Amino acid sequence: MKSLEPKKLILIGASTGGPAHIEKIAAALPENFEAAIVVAQHMGAEFIPSFAKRLNERSKLSVMQAREGDALQKGVLYIVSEHAQIIQNGEYLVFSIHTNPNAHFNPDINTLFLSAAHFVKGCEIVAFILTGIGDDGVEGCIALEEGGARCIAESEKTAVVYGMPARAKERGANIHAKDLYEIIEIIKQFGA
């Protein structure tokens, strides 16, 4: 597969306890960041715009809610809602966003991660499963890992709820747990 834009992609999935952790990540990132960041944080769709606005006020990066057809750009942190997927349009990765009345989560982390797994050969990807209840994102993390992406789960020490990260670590052969401050450093290094 030929090289895609953006060349580096960071995926973050979170649930209970995630907003505060995502705020810490967003606030720590420097300008001139060389990766696109896509965040799937479980919350009602009506709260996504205000969450994106709050992050944008605290980050040196541009933060916005992902919209249908938006091309992913380096140095931008996107907050997804609904049934968001990443698809290819020429040499660019773009968002495809649909409503799914049967979805258990908003947004669905597995849907996002599974869609990105198709592009591991054309784009360098690192994915993170942060604090949260249940197992959303685990299946997608495993698909990313099997394709060659690096996947990291938040540690029990810093996760508010060690459900999703624990399931990812249990099921993924190479998924390791890291404290939140270590995750922030990994993200900063990846986007340098």
Where are these regions (language model features)?
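Conserved acid/base catalytic micro-environments in cytosolic active-site loops
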Residues: 1-192
